[in-house]
Amino acid sequence: VRDGYIAKPENCAHHCFPGSSGCDTLCKENGGTGGHCGFKVGHGTACWCNALPDKVGIIVDGVKCH
């Protein structure tokens, strides 16, 4: 279990709108305890999740979205 920016395939961010409930819902649907919209350098707005299961991908620093 770990916290991080949940990733789409190919290390891409789930973009979001600050203040919306979309990230919290996405994180919970993927087994996390909740989340919010944050900002990830190089990706822009992105969903940050708390306590995601290890099987759920998170953004890896230094790897470009492709």
Curated annotation (Swiss-Prot):
Family matches, as SUPFAM superfamilies: Scorpion toxin-like (SSF57095)
BP term (GO), one: defense response
Similarity comment: family membership: Belongs to the long (4 C-C) scorpion toxin superfamily. Sodium channel inhibitor family. Alpha subfamily.
GO cellular component: extracellular region
Stated name of the protein: Alpha-like toxin Lqh7
Annotated LCN-type CS-alpha/beta domain residues: 2-66
PROSITE patterns attached to this UniProt entry: LCN_CSAB (PS51863)
Annotated function: Alpha toxins bind voltage-independently at site-3 of sodium channels (Nav) and inhibit the inactivation of the activated channels, thereby blocking neuronal transmission. This toxin is highly toxic to insects and mice, and inhibits the binding of alpha-toxin to cockroach neuronal membranes.
Disulfide bridge partners, by residue number: C12-C65, C16-C37, C23-C47, C27-C49
